[in-house]
Amino acid sequence: MNTPKLLPSLMCVDFSRMAQTLEVFEQCGIDALHVDIMDGEFVPNYALGTDFCRQLRKLTPIPLDIHLMISRPDTKLSCFAIKPGEYVSVHWESTPHIHRTIGAIAALGGKPMLAINPATPYDVIRYLLPDLAGVLVMTVDPGFAGQQLVPAMLQKLRDLRAFLDENGYPDLEIEVDGNVSFENAEKMRQAGATMFVGGSSSVFWKGASLSENIQRMYAVIGKRNIAVLQAVK
């Protein structure tokens, strides 16, 4: 059984407080930082980019969880200077050469993750299983923060978890991205999720401090050995 992981979505961060935010993340033992890369083509929005990843690595030792919402990622992987052990998610729908792309990520030292949109069946991963570190299940349509959970995705998570177990991959990670709120995260955990992308409805919720939100999410997803920290206002 994988240890639950919390991945703050930097699409939701207040960039004017980046240094303070990263300090809190380090103090709280955040597992990885979720970086959404959007090209305005695969999704109708632009976000972050290659230089952002490079600069971020200079500011914190926390590893990155790079989510490539871009067309033809197989032609652009070299732009991201992927570091050993970093998670890199590519969409099933983004390239006709998905197996080659996953292999290229692994060759660079990354941990390949296959991302699937809400309407994409989970079993498209069948022949890729030996090469994957995990599956990223989009629980909203990709492209924008603040959307509501697609209700059918909870059943999709249950079906995917059963599929992985039945095929001999019980330790493959299941990452969830989209409206991973305090309430939804518990349902997602019960459905089989192990990695949780926290955005405006959890980690960056305005109703409490950043550290308080993180501690609350840790409790929800079952992450143990939590340090009790003074709230950072």
Q: Which residues make up each language-model segment?
A:
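Hydrophobic faces of well-ordered beta-strands that scaffold small-molecule active sites
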Residues: 4-10, 33-35, 56, 64-68, ...
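Conserved, mostly hydrophobic/aromatic
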Residues: 18, 25, 36, 80, ...
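Catalytic cores of alpha/beta
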Residues: 21-22, 72-82, 119-132, 178-196
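Structural motif
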Residues: 28, 59, 83, 108, ...
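N-terminal active-site wall of soluble small-molecule enzyme domains
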Residues: 35, 39-104
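Glycine/Thr-rich beta-alpha phosphate-binding loop at enzyme active sites
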Residues: 39-47, 51, 118, 128-162, ...
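Glycine-rich phosphate-binding active-site loops on the catalytic face of alpha/beta enzymes
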Residues: 88-96, 136-148, 191-213
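C-terminal helical cap(s) of enzyme catalytic domains, especially alpha/beta-barrels
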Residues: 189, 203-233
